[in-house]
UniProtKB/Swiss-Prot annotation:
Role this protein plays: Autoreceptor for octopamine (OA), which is a neurotransmitter, neurohormone, and neuromodulator in invertebrates. Essential for ovulation and fertilization. During ovulation it mediates the OA-induced relaxation of the oviduct visceral muscles, by increasing cAMP levels and activating effectors such as calmodulin-dependent kinase II (CaMKII) and cAMP-dependent protein kinase A (PKA) pathways. Positively regulates synaptic growth; an action that is antagonized by Octbeta1R.
Protein name (database record): Octopamine receptor beta-2R
Keywords tagged on the record: Cell membrane, G-protein coupled receptor, Glycoprotein, Membrane, Receptor, Transducer, Transmembrane, Transmembrane helix
PANTHER family tied to this protein: ADRENERGIC RECEPTOR-RELATED G-PROTEIN COUPLED RECEPTOR, OCTOPAMINE RECEPTOR BETA-2R
Annotated source species: Drosophila melanogaster (Fruit fly)
GO BP terms: adenylate cyclase-activating adrenergic receptor signaling pathway; adenylate cyclase-activating G protein-coupled receptor signaling pathway; fertilization; G protein-coupled receptor signaling pathway; ovulation; positive regulation of MAPK cascade; positive regulation of synaptic assembly at neuromuscular junction
PROSITE patterns (UniProt xref): G_PROTEIN_RECEP_F1_1 (PS00237), G_PROTEIN_RECEP_F1_2 (PS50262)
Length: 536
Protein backbone atom coordinates (compact mmCIF):
# COMPACT_ATOMS: atom_id res chain seq x y z
CA UNK A 1 0.00 0.00 0.00
CA UNK A 2 1.46 3.40 -1.05
CA UNK A 3 1.19 6.02 1.67
CA UNK A 4 2.57 8.89 -0.39
CA UNK A 5 4.26 9.51 -3.69
CA UNK A 6 7.48 10.60 -1.95
CA UNK A 7 7.47 7.67 0.47
CA UNK A 8 7.37 4.11 -0.49
CA UNK A 9 5.27 1.42 1.10
CA UNK A 10 5.79 1.12 4.82
CA UNK A 11 7.91 -1.80 5.95
CA UNK A 12 5.90 -4.60 7.56
CA UNK A 13 7.90 -4.59 10.82
CA UNK A 14 7.44 -0.85 11.23
CA UNK A 15 3.72 -1.14 10.41
CA UNK A 16 3.18 -3.59 13.25
CA UNK A 17 5.25 -1.63 15.74
CA UNK A 18 3.48 1.65 15.09
CA UNK A 19 0.05 0.56 16.39
CA UNK A 20 -1.47 1.77 19.64
CA UNK A 21 -3.15 -0.64 21.97
CA UNK A 22 -6.26 1.47 22.50
CA UNK A 23 -7.56 2.29 19.05
CA UNK A 24 -5.26 0.12 16.88
CA UNK A 25 -4.38 3.13 14.72
CA UNK A 26 -1.45 2.63 12.34
CA UNK A 27 1.31 5.24 12.65
CA UNK A 28 3.52 6.36 9.81
CA UNK A 29 5.94 9.24 9.19
CA UNK A 30 4.54 12.51 8.10
CA UNK A 31 4.27 12.96 4.41
CA UNK A 32 6.99 15.17 3.01
CA UNK A 33 4.48 16.84 0.74
CA UNK A 34 2.73 18.31 3.76
CA UNK A 35 3.89 21.19 5.92
CA UNK A 36 7.56 21.93 5.81
CA UNK A 37 8.13 21.87 9.53
CA UNK A 38 6.56 18.51 10.05
CA UNK A 39 9.43 16.55 8.69
CA UNK A 40 11.81 17.56 11.47
CA UNK A 41 10.19 15.32 14.11
CA UNK A 42 12.62 13.25 16.18
CA UNK A 43 12.39 9.50 15.99
CA UNK A 44 13.16 7.41 19.06
CA UNK A 45 14.98 4.12 18.96
CA UNK A 46 12.88 1.30 17.68
CA UNK A 47 11.15 3.42 15.05
CA UNK A 48 8.46 4.90 17.36
CA UNK A 49 7.59 8.53 16.94
CA UNK A 50 6.99 10.41 20.15
CA UNK A 51 4.42 13.04 19.08
CA UNK A 52 1.93 10.70 17.36
CA UNK A 53 1.30 8.90 20.69
CA UNK A 54 -0.52 11.90 22.19
CA UNK A 55 -2.37 12.31 18.94
CA UNK A 56 -3.59 8.71 19.14
CA UNK A 57 -4.75 9.20 22.72
CA UNK A 58 -6.79 12.21 21.67
CA UNK A 59 -8.34 10.17 18.89
CA UNK A 60 -9.21 7.45 21.39
CA UNK A 61 -10.88 9.97 23.70
CA UNK A 62 -12.79 11.45 20.79
CA UNK A 63 -13.95 7.99 19.74
CA UNK A 64 -15.20 7.24 23.25
CA UNK A 65 -17.09 10.53 23.47
CA UNK A 66 -18.63 9.89 20.07
CA UNK A 67 -19.72 6.39 21.08
CA UNK A 68 -21.26 7.71 24.31
CA UNK A 69 -23.09 10.42 22.39
CA UNK A 70 -24.43 7.89 19.89
CA UNK A 71 -25.56 5.60 22.71
CA UNK A 72 -27.32 8.47 24.48
CA UNK A 73 -28.98 9.53 21.24
CA UNK A 74 -30.21 5.99 20.65
CA UNK A 75 -31.61 5.77 24.18
CA UNK A 76 -33.31 9.15 23.83
CA UNK A 77 -34.78 8.02 20.54
CA UNK A 78 -36.17 4.93 22.23
CA UNK A 79 -37.57 7.06 25.04
CA UNK A 80 -39.27 9.42 22.60
CA UNK A 81 -40.78 6.47 20.77
CA UNK A 82 -42.18 5.10 24.03
CA UNK A 83 -43.48 8.53 24.94
CA UNK A 84 -45.14 8.86 21.55
CA UNK A 85 -46.77 5.46 22.02
CA UNK A 86 -48.00 6.43 25.48
CA UNK A 87 -49.34 9.77 24.27
CA UNK A 88 -51.15 8.15 21.36
CA UNK A 89 -52.78 5.61 23.65
CA UNK A 90 -53.65 8.39 26.08
CA UNK A 91 -55.19 10.44 23.27
CA UNK A 92 -57.19 7.44 22.13
CA UNK A 93 -58.42 6.82 25.64
CA UNK A 94 -59.19 10.50 26.17
CA UNK A 95 -61.31 10.63 23.04
CA UNK A 96 -63.08 7.36 23.68
CA UNK A 97 -63.13 6.90 27.46
CA UNK A 98 -62.17 8.15 30.90
CA UNK A 99 -61.06 6.64 34.18
CA UNK A 100 -63.69 5.11 36.41
CA UNK A 101 -63.82 6.88 39.75
CA UNK A 102 -64.40 4.03 42.15
CA UNK A 103 -62.35 1.26 40.60
CA UNK A 104 -59.51 2.71 38.60
CA UNK A 105 -55.87 1.99 39.27
CA UNK A 106 -54.46 5.34 38.28
CA UNK A 107 -50.90 4.96 39.67
CA UNK A 108 -50.39 1.78 37.61
CA UNK A 109 -52.24 2.77 34.45
CA UNK A 110 -49.23 2.28 32.20
CA UNK A 111 -45.61 1.35 32.57
CA UNK A 112 -44.34 4.91 32.48
CA UNK A 113 -46.13 5.71 35.72
CA UNK A 114 -44.83 2.69 37.61
CA UNK A 115 -42.15 4.30 39.74
CA UNK A 116 -39.83 2.26 41.92
CA UNK A 117 -39.65 2.90 45.66
CA UNK A 118 -36.32 3.85 47.22
CA UNK A 119 -34.87 4.76 43.81
CA UNK A 120 -34.12 1.25 42.62
CA UNK A 121 -31.83 0.45 39.74
CA UNK A 122 -32.91 0.09 36.16
CA UNK A 123 -34.67 2.48 33.83
CA UNK A 124 -37.19 4.74 35.52
CA UNK A 125 -39.44 6.92 33.39
CA UNK A 126 -41.29 9.89 34.71
CA UNK A 127 -44.96 10.70 34.13
CA UNK A 128 -44.57 12.27 30.69
CA UNK A 129 -42.05 9.73 29.49
CA UNK A 130 -39.55 12.42 28.44
CA UNK A 131 -37.09 11.94 31.28
CA UNK A 132 -34.64 9.09 31.62
CA UNK A 133 -32.61 8.01 34.60
CA UNK A 134 -30.26 5.06 34.86
CA UNK A 135 -28.04 3.57 37.54
CA UNK A 136 -25.31 6.15 36.91
CA UNK A 137 -27.77 8.96 37.53
CA UNK A 138 -29.00 7.27 40.71
CA UNK A 139 -25.44 7.22 41.97
CA UNK A 140 -25.21 10.98 41.43
CA UNK A 141 -28.36 11.69 43.48
CA UNK A 142 -28.04 13.68 46.64
CA UNK A 143 -28.20 11.38 49.70
CA UNK A 144 -30.40 13.93 51.46
CA UNK A 145 -32.95 13.73 48.66
CA UNK A 146 -32.97 9.93 48.79
CA UNK A 147 -33.41 10.05 52.56
CA UNK A 148 -36.32 12.48 52.19
CA UNK A 149 -37.96 10.27 49.55
CA UNK A 150 -37.66 7.28 51.86
CA UNK A 151 -39.24 9.21 54.72
CA UNK A 152 -42.14 10.31 52.51
CA UNK A 153 -42.62 6.74 51.29
CA UNK A 154 -42.68 5.34 54.82
CA UNK A 155 -45.08 8.05 56.01
CA UNK A 156 -47.45 7.40 53.10
CA UNK A 157 -47.44 3.67 53.74
CA UNK A 158 -48.01 4.20 57.48
CA UNK A 159 -51.00 6.52 56.92
CA UNK A 160 -52.66 4.17 54.44
CA UNK A 161 -52.09 1.16 56.69
CA UNK A 162 -53.52 3.07 59.66
CA UNK A 163 -56.66 3.94 57.68
CA UNK A 164 -57.15 0.29 56.72
CA UNK A 165 -56.72 -1.04 60.28
CA UNK A 166 -58.94 1.67 61.80
CA UNK A 167 -61.70 1.00 59.27
CA UNK A 168 -61.69 -2.74 59.96
CA UNK A 169 -61.49 -2.52 63.76
CA UNK A 170 -63.93 0.39 64.13
CA UNK A 171 -66.68 -1.10 62.00
CA UNK A 172 -66.19 -4.50 63.58
CA UNK A 173 -66.69 -2.84 66.97
CA UNK A 174 -69.98 -1.37 65.71
CA UNK A 175 -71.26 -4.81 64.69
CA UNK A 176 -70.26 -6.46 67.98
CA UNK A 177 -71.76 -3.65 70.08
CA UNK A 178 -75.13 -3.79 68.33
CA UNK A 179 -75.23 -7.56 68.75
CA UNK A 180 -74.39 -7.36 72.48
CA UNK A 181 -76.52 -4.41 73.59
CA UNK A 182 -80.27 -4.94 73.37
CA UNK A 183 -81.01 -1.21 73.44
CA UNK A 184 -79.21 -0.76 70.12
CA UNK A 185 -81.27 -3.38 68.32
CA UNK A 186 -83.61 -0.97 66.57
CA UNK A 187 -84.58 -0.76 62.92
CA UNK A 188 -82.25 2.14 62.17
CA UNK A 189 -79.25 0.22 63.45
CA UNK A 190 -80.00 -2.60 61.00
CA UNK A 191 -78.84 -0.19 58.32
CA UNK A 192 -75.91 0.84 60.51
CA UNK A 193 -74.73 -2.77 60.90
CA UNK A 194 -75.08 -3.39 57.18
CA UNK A 195 -73.16 -0.16 56.50
CA UNK A 196 -70.39 -1.33 58.84
CA UNK A 197 -70.14 -4.60 56.92
CA UNK A 198 -69.85 -2.70 53.63
CA UNK A 199 -67.13 -0.45 55.07
CA UNK A 200 -65.19 -3.48 56.30
CA UNK A 201 -65.29 -4.97 52.82
CA UNK A 202 -64.14 -1.65 51.34
CA UNK A 203 -61.12 -1.78 53.64
CA UNK A 204 -60.32 -5.42 52.87
CA UNK A 205 -61.13 -5.68 49.17
CA UNK A 206 -60.43 -2.17 47.87
CA UNK A 207 -57.94 -0.44 50.15
CA UNK A 208 -55.52 -3.35 50.37
CA UNK A 209 -55.00 -3.64 46.60
CA UNK A 210 -54.68 0.13 46.27
CA UNK A 211 -52.17 0.07 49.12
CA UNK A 212 -50.10 -2.50 47.23
CA UNK A 213 -50.11 -0.37 44.08
CA UNK A 214 -49.20 2.81 45.96
CA UNK A 215 -46.33 1.18 47.87
CA UNK A 216 -44.76 -0.90 45.10
CA UNK A 217 -45.65 1.38 42.20
CA UNK A 218 -46.88 -1.45 39.97
CA UNK A 219 -49.55 -4.12 39.70
CA UNK A 220 -48.30 -7.34 41.29
CA UNK A 221 -51.18 -9.67 40.44
CA UNK A 222 -52.88 -11.29 37.46
CA UNK A 223 -55.18 -9.53 34.94
CA UNK A 224 -58.16 -11.42 36.37
CA UNK A 225 -57.45 -10.02 39.83
CA UNK A 226 -57.19 -6.56 38.27
CA UNK A 227 -60.76 -6.82 36.96
CA UNK A 228 -61.86 -8.36 40.25
CA UNK A 229 -60.30 -5.52 42.23
CA UNK A 230 -61.98 -2.88 40.08
CA UNK A 231 -65.31 -4.68 40.41
CA UNK A 232 -65.05 -5.00 44.19
CA UNK A 233 -64.01 -1.38 44.53
CA UNK A 234 -67.05 -0.17 42.59
CA UNK A 235 -69.35 -2.66 44.32
CA UNK A 236 -68.56 -2.02 47.97
CA UNK A 237 -68.08 1.73 47.61
CA UNK A 238 -71.47 2.04 45.92
CA UNK A 239 -73.04 -0.21 48.56
CA UNK A 240 -71.67 1.99 51.34
CA UNK A 241 -73.11 5.12 49.72
CA UNK A 242 -76.52 3.49 49.16
CA UNK A 243 -76.63 2.46 52.83
CA UNK A 244 -76.25 6.10 53.84
CA UNK A 245 -79.11 6.96 51.51
CA UNK A 246 -81.34 4.30 53.12
CA UNK A 247 -80.49 5.62 56.58
CA UNK A 248 -81.57 9.13 55.56
CA UNK A 249 -84.90 7.78 54.26
CA UNK A 250 -85.45 5.86 57.51
CA UNK A 251 -84.81 9.00 59.58
CA UNK A 252 -87.12 10.98 57.32
CA UNK A 253 -90.08 8.71 58.10
CA UNK A 254 -89.18 8.52 61.80
CA UNK A 255 -89.17 12.31 62.34
CA UNK A 256 -91.18 13.93 59.55
CA UNK A 257 -93.89 11.25 59.38
CA UNK A 258 -93.85 9.53 62.77
CA UNK A 259 -97.40 8.16 62.45
CA UNK A 260 -96.56 6.38 59.20
CA UNK A 261 -93.19 5.12 60.43
CA UNK A 262 -94.43 1.88 62.11
CA UNK A 263 -96.44 1.07 58.99
CA UNK A 264 -93.85 2.09 56.42
CA UNK A 265 -90.65 0.84 58.05
CA UNK A 266 -91.43 -2.75 58.95
CA UNK A 267 -88.86 -5.51 59.08
CA UNK A 268 -90.02 -6.73 55.68
CA UNK A 269 -89.55 -3.30 54.10
CA UNK A 270 -86.13 -2.91 55.74
CA UNK A 271 -85.10 -6.34 54.45
CA UNK A 272 -86.14 -5.41 50.90
CA UNK A 273 -84.22 -2.14 51.11
CA UNK A 274 -81.08 -3.89 52.34
CA UNK A 275 -81.39 -6.57 49.67
CA UNK A 276 -81.68 -3.92 46.99
CA UNK A 277 -78.70 -2.10 48.48
CA UNK A 278 -76.52 -5.19 48.12
CA UNK A 279 -77.80 -6.39 44.71
CA UNK A 280 -77.95 -3.19 42.66
CA UNK A 281 -74.19 -2.42 42.90
CA UNK A 282 -73.46 -5.87 41.42
CA UNK A 283 -75.34 -4.89 38.27
CA UNK A 284 -73.12 -1.83 38.06
CA UNK A 285 -69.76 -3.49 38.75
CA UNK A 286 -69.34 -7.20 38.08
CA UNK A 287 -71.65 -7.59 35.10
CA UNK A 288 -70.36 -4.78 32.83
CA UNK A 289 -66.71 -5.16 33.86
CA UNK A 290 -66.34 -8.89 33.20
CA UNK A 291 -68.48 -8.80 30.05
CA UNK A 292 -66.63 -5.78 28.68
CA UNK A 293 -69.46 -3.27 28.35
CA UNK A 294 -67.66 -0.64 30.39
CA UNK A 295 -64.64 0.09 28.22
CA UNK A 296 -63.57 1.10 24.72
CA UNK A 297 -62.12 -1.05 21.89
CA UNK A 298 -58.77 0.72 22.24
CA UNK A 299 -58.54 -0.24 25.88
CA UNK A 300 -59.48 -3.84 25.18
CA UNK A 301 -56.61 -4.02 22.70
CA UNK A 302 -54.31 -2.43 25.27
CA UNK A 303 -55.26 -5.04 27.88
CA UNK A 304 -54.49 -7.84 25.42
CA UNK A 305 -51.09 -6.36 24.58
CA UNK A 306 -50.19 -5.52 28.22
CA UNK A 307 -51.47 -8.30 30.48
CA UNK A 308 -49.15 -7.33 33.35
CA UNK A 309 -50.59 -3.82 33.75
CA UNK A 310 -53.77 -2.89 35.60
CA UNK A 311 -55.37 -0.10 33.61
CA UNK A 312 -59.09 0.67 33.66
CA UNK A 313 -60.66 3.00 31.10
CA UNK A 314 -64.41 3.35 30.59
CA UNK A 315 -66.63 4.88 27.97
CA UNK A 316 -68.70 7.95 28.68
CA UNK A 317 -72.03 6.11 28.85
CA UNK A 318 -70.82 3.86 31.63
CA UNK A 319 -69.16 6.79 33.37
CA UNK A 320 -72.39 8.81 33.45
CA UNK A 321 -74.46 5.86 34.70
CA UNK A 322 -71.95 4.78 37.34
CA UNK A 323 -71.38 8.27 38.73
CA UNK A 324 -75.12 8.97 38.88
CA UNK A 325 -75.97 5.76 40.73
CA UNK A 326 -72.90 5.82 42.96
CA UNK A 327 -72.98 9.44 44.09
CA UNK A 328 -75.17 12.09 42.50
CA UNK A 329 -78.61 10.50 42.94
CA UNK A 330 -77.99 9.26 46.54
CA UNK A 331 -76.42 12.58 47.47
CA UNK A 332 -79.44 14.50 46.16
CA UNK A 333 -81.84 12.26 48.10
CA UNK A 334 -79.83 12.67 51.31
CA UNK A 335 -79.72 16.45 50.99
CA UNK A 336 -83.49 16.75 50.55
CA UNK A 337 -84.34 14.28 53.32
CA UNK A 338 -82.04 15.86 55.88
CA UNK A 339 -83.24 19.35 55.05
CA UNK A 340 -86.79 18.15 55.71
CA UNK A 341 -85.64 16.42 58.91
CA UNK A 342 -83.95 19.52 60.32
CA UNK A 343 -86.92 21.70 59.41
CA UNK A 344 -89.37 19.32 61.10
CA UNK A 345 -87.10 18.90 64.13
CA UNK A 346 -86.98 22.65 64.69
CA UNK A 347 -90.76 22.92 64.34
CA UNK A 348 -91.42 20.11 66.82
CA UNK A 349 -88.94 21.54 69.29
CA UNK A 350 -90.70 24.92 69.22
CA UNK A 351 -94.08 23.25 69.74
CA UNK A 352 -92.79 21.25 72.69
CA UNK A 353 -91.35 24.35 74.30
CA UNK A 354 -94.63 26.22 73.85
CA UNK A 355 -96.65 23.34 75.33
CA UNK A 356 -94.27 23.03 78.23
CA UNK A 357 -94.54 26.76 78.92
CA UNK A 358 -98.35 26.70 78.77
CA UNK A 359 -98.46 23.74 81.13
CA UNK A 360 -96.31 25.59 83.65
CA UNK A 361 -98.61 28.64 83.47
CA UNK A 362 -101.70 26.47 83.99
CA UNK A 363 -100.27 24.74 87.07
CA UNK A 364 -99.03 27.84 88.88
CA UNK A 365 -102.50 29.37 89.79
CA UNK A 366 -103.91 26.03 90.85
CA UNK A 367 -101.13 25.51 93.37
CA UNK A 368 -101.75 28.75 95.30
CA UNK A 369 -105.05 27.70 97.06
CA UNK A 370 -103.42 24.51 98.25
CA UNK A 371 -100.70 26.58 99.86
CA UNK A 372 -103.19 28.85 101.61
CA UNK A 373 -105.50 26.13 102.99
CA UNK A 374 -103.08 23.86 104.76
CA UNK A 375 -105.57 22.94 107.50
CA UNK A 376 -108.72 20.91 107.12
CA UNK A 377 -109.27 19.86 103.55
CA UNK A 378 -106.14 21.66 102.33
CA UNK A 379 -104.08 18.53 102.54
CA UNK A 380 -106.55 16.69 100.35
CA UNK A 381 -106.41 19.51 97.78
CA UNK A 382 -102.65 19.39 97.77
CA UNK A 383 -102.71 15.65 97.33
CA UNK A 384 -105.20 15.95 94.46
CA UNK A 385 -103.06 18.53 92.65
CA UNK A 386 -99.98 16.42 93.23
CA UNK A 387 -101.72 13.40 91.75
CA UNK A 388 -102.84 15.40 88.70
CA UNK A 389 -99.32 16.69 88.21
CA UNK A 390 -97.92 13.17 88.50
CA UNK A 391 -100.49 11.96 85.96
CA UNK A 392 -99.61 14.50 83.27
CA UNK A 393 -95.91 15.20 83.75
CA UNK A 394 -94.46 11.71 83.07
CA UNK A 395 -96.29 11.46 79.75
CA UNK A 396 -94.97 14.81 78.59
CA UNK A 397 -91.49 14.04 79.85
CA UNK A 398 -91.54 10.69 78.08
CA UNK A 399 -92.61 12.27 74.82
CA UNK A 400 -89.99 14.99 75.23
CA UNK A 401 -87.24 12.47 75.91
CA UNK A 402 -88.28 10.44 72.89
CA UNK A 403 -88.20 13.49 70.63
CA UNK A 404 -84.81 14.53 71.96
CA UNK A 405 -83.49 11.05 71.28
CA UNK A 406 -84.82 11.13 67.73
CA UNK A 407 -83.30 14.56 67.14
CA UNK A 408 -79.95 13.44 68.53
CA UNK A 409 -79.97 10.42 66.25
CA UNK A 410 -80.86 12.65 63.32
CA UNK A 411 -78.02 15.00 64.21
CA UNK A 412 -75.56 12.12 64.40
CA UNK A 413 -76.66 10.73 61.06
CA UNK A 414 -76.60 14.23 59.60
CA UNK A 415 -72.96 14.55 60.63
CA UNK A 416 -72.32 11.20 58.97
CA UNK A 417 -73.92 12.51 55.78
CA UNK A 418 -71.84 15.69 55.98
CA UNK A 419 -68.60 13.77 56.30
CA UNK A 420 -69.68 11.55 53.43
CA UNK A 421 -70.17 14.59 51.18
CA UNK A 422 -66.86 16.13 52.26
CA UNK A 423 -65.02 12.88 51.60
CA UNK A 424 -66.50 11.93 48.24
CA UNK A 425 -67.43 15.29 46.70
CA UNK A 426 -63.84 16.31 45.75
CA UNK A 427 -63.30 12.99 44.01
CA UNK A 428 -66.52 13.15 42.00
CA UNK A 429 -65.91 16.77 41.11
CA UNK A 430 -62.59 15.70 39.61
CA UNK A 431 -64.37 12.86 37.87
CA UNK A 432 -66.95 15.22 36.39
CA UNK A 433 -64.26 17.60 35.19
CA UNK A 434 -62.40 14.71 33.58
CA UNK A 435 -65.58 13.88 31.65
CA UNK A 436 -66.33 17.41 30.47
CA UNK A 437 -62.78 18.70 30.03
CA UNK A 438 -60.67 16.19 28.12
CA UNK A 439 -57.63 18.48 28.08
CA UNK A 440 -57.61 18.93 31.87
CA UNK A 441 -54.83 16.83 33.36
CA UNK A 442 -54.50 16.10 37.08
CA UNK A 443 -51.28 14.67 38.57
CA UNK A 444 -51.41 11.08 39.70
CA UNK A 445 -50.53 12.02 43.27
CA UNK A 446 -53.61 14.26 43.46
CA UNK A 447 -55.85 11.49 42.14
CA UNK A 448 -54.41 9.06 44.70
CA UNK A 449 -55.09 11.53 47.51
CA UNK A 450 -58.68 11.95 46.32
CA UNK A 451 -59.12 8.17 46.33
CA UNK A 452 -57.89 7.80 49.89
CA UNK A 453 -59.99 10.72 51.12
CA UNK A 454 -63.01 8.82 49.83
CA UNK A 455 -61.79 5.63 51.48
CA UNK A 456 -61.33 7.55 54.72
CA UNK A 457 -65.12 7.93 54.95
CA UNK A 458 -65.35 4.23 55.87
CA UNK A 459 -63.09 4.93 58.85
CA UNK A 460 -64.92 8.01 60.11
CA UNK A 461 -68.37 6.46 60.65
CA UNK A 462 -67.51 4.51 63.86
CA UNK A 463 -65.71 7.58 65.27
CA UNK A 464 -68.83 9.67 64.68
CA UNK A 465 -70.98 7.09 66.48
CA UNK A 466 -68.64 7.02 69.47
CA UNK A 467 -68.41 10.80 69.79
CA UNK A 468 -71.99 11.96 69.14
CA UNK A 469 -74.14 9.04 70.35
CA UNK A 470 -74.14 8.20 74.04
CA UNK A 471 -75.64 4.73 73.55
CA UNK A 472 -72.95 3.74 71.08
CA UNK A 473 -70.27 5.31 73.25
CA UNK A 474 -71.32 3.26 76.27
CA UNK A 475 -71.66 0.14 74.15
CA UNK A 476 -68.17 0.63 72.73
CA UNK A 477 -66.74 1.11 76.21
CA UNK A 478 -68.45 -1.98 77.59
CA UNK A 479 -67.42 -4.08 74.60
CA UNK A 480 -63.79 -3.03 74.87
CA UNK A 481 -63.78 -3.66 78.62
CA UNK A 482 -65.34 -7.06 78.07
CA UNK A 483 -62.75 -7.96 75.45
CA UNK A 484 -59.95 -6.77 77.69
CA UNK A 485 -61.29 -8.67 80.68
CA UNK A 486 -61.62 -11.84 78.63
CA UNK A 487 -58.08 -11.43 77.35
CA UNK A 488 -56.76 -10.78 80.86
CA UNK A 489 -58.72 -13.68 82.29
CA UNK A 490 -57.49 -16.10 79.61
CA UNK A 491 -53.93 -14.92 80.09
CA UNK A 492 -53.70 -14.92 83.88
CA UNK A 493 -56.74 -16.86 85.17
CA UNK A 494 -57.55 -19.73 82.80
CA UNK A 495 -61.05 -20.71 83.93
CA UNK A 496 -63.57 -22.83 82.08
CA UNK A 497 -66.55 -20.49 82.46
CA UNK A 498 -70.00 -21.40 81.19
CA UNK A 499 -71.92 -18.19 80.48
CA UNK A 500 -75.21 -20.06 80.81
CA UNK A 501 -74.60 -20.69 84.53
CA UNK A 502 -76.08 -18.40 87.11
CA UNK A 503 -73.98 -15.79 88.83
CA UNK A 504 -74.34 -17.55 92.22
CA UNK A 505 -72.92 -20.79 90.85
CA UNK A 506 -70.10 -18.87 89.18
CA UNK A 507 -69.26 -17.15 92.49
CA UNK A 508 -69.23 -20.50 94.28
CA UNK A 509 -66.80 -21.90 91.71
CA UNK A 510 -64.65 -18.79 91.79
CA UNK A 511 -64.04 -18.85 95.55
CA UNK A 512 -61.01 -21.04 95.09
CA UNK A 513 -59.43 -18.49 92.80
CA UNK A 514 -60.55 -15.09 94.06
CA UNK A 515 -60.04 -14.04 97.64
CA UNK A 516 -62.90 -13.75 100.10
CA UNK A 517 -62.27 -10.03 100.47
CA UNK A 518 -62.92 -9.56 96.76
CA UNK A 519 -66.14 -11.58 96.76
CA UNK A 520 -67.48 -10.00 99.96
CA UNK A 521 -66.35 -6.45 99.22
CA UNK A 522 -68.87 -3.65 99.37
CA UNK A 523 -66.93 -0.92 97.57
CA UNK A 524 -68.64 0.43 94.44
CA UNK A 525 -65.68 -0.29 92.18
CA UNK A 526 -65.55 -3.93 93.23
CA UNK A 527 -69.30 -4.21 92.87
CA UNK A 528 -69.12 -2.94 89.32
CA UNK A 529 -66.35 -5.41 88.50
CA UNK A 530 -68.24 -8.32 90.02
CA UNK A 531 -71.41 -7.35 88.16
CA UNK A 532 -69.45 -7.14 84.95
CA UNK A 533 -68.03 -10.61 85.51
CA UNK A 534 -71.52 -11.91 86.34
CA UNK A 535 -72.88 -10.49 83.10
CA UNK A 536 -70.35 -12.51 81.16
Amino acid sequence: MLLCDGLGPEPPRQRHRNRTSAARIRKRPKCCCGDGGSGNQAEQPGGIVSNPISYGQSLTTLARVTAAALTTAAMLHTTNALAATGSSSASNSSTGGIALPLGTATPATHELNATQPFGGSGLNFNESGAGLSDHHHHQQHNPDEDWLDNIVWVFKAFVMLLIIIAAICGNLLVIISVMRVRKLRVITNYFVVSLAMADIMVAIMAMTFNFSVQVTGRWNFSPFLCDLWNSLDVYFSTASILHLCCISVDRYYAIVKPLKYPISMTKRVVGIMLLNTWISPALLSFLPIFIGWYTTPQHQQFVIQNPTQCSFVVNKYYAVISSSISFWIPCTIMIFTYLAIFREANRQEKQLMMRHGNAMLMHRPSMQPSGEALSGSGSSKTLTLHEVEQEHTPTKDKHLIKMKREHKAARTLGIIMGTFILCWLPFFLWYTLSMTCEECQVPDIVVSILFWIGYFNSTLNPLIYAYFNRDFREAFRNTLLCLFCNWWKDRHLPLDIDIRRSSLRYDQRAKSVYSESYLNSTTPSHRRQSQMVDNL
